[in-house]
Amino acid sequence: MAELNLDYYTAKDHYSDGDIEETLLKMAQEGKSFEDLPEEEVSFPMVYHFSGLRENILSWYPLKKADSVLEIGAGCGAITGMLCRKAGHVTSVELSKRRADINYARNRDKENLTIMVGNLNDMTFPEKFDYVVVNGVLEYAMSFTEGKNSLRDISSAYGRLSEAGGKTSDRH
């Protein structure tokens, strides 16, 4: 079973899609997809967060079962499940607890998943990762990073988290 780690959670969610996230959580807990709903009930956030098409962003990449992946900005888990199917272990970081709860509900059966809730800048990891995946959050990350040159600081931090020769991917 996946692990939901709240050690770095400050009880403050910094962003949200609003009340639709409660609907998304309920859908995830019930194992439902937006495809199960009548068309008039489907909204953009449902499709955005739950469409299997989003996995295509990295499904082609030849991850191996020996690989460890750090997923930064995991959101509601749009690509988390795919990463878990391909890699040996996935550590997903999400700033919003509600989104992490949705990700957990979607992927709770994954034995190789740890979801960490909180600001990446506050976290420490006992190991480095073979791959660091930044999926559509780089443009927001600067809002949660202090410093004069936050983009450079963020890129440097990602590099420190990956093994020597590790790969960093920023996909939108």
Predicted segments, located by residue:
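N-terminal auxiliary segments of SAM/dcSAM-dependent transferases
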Residues: M1-A28
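Conserved class I S-adenosyl-L-methionine
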Residues: A66-G75
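Conserved SAM-binding loop of SAM-dependent methyltransferases across substrates and taxa
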Residues: C76-A87
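Conserved SAM-binding motif I beta-strand of class I
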Residues: H89-E94
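Conserved SAM/SAH-binding beta-strand->alpha-helix loop
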Residues: S96-R98
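Conserved SAM-binding strand-loop segment of SAM-dependent methyltransferases
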Residues: D109-L120
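A short acidic, Gly/Pro-enriched loop at the edge of an enzyme's catalytic core
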Residues: T124-V132
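A short glycine-rich, Lys/Arg-flanked "PGG" loop and its adjoining helix->strand segment in the class I
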Residues: N149-G166
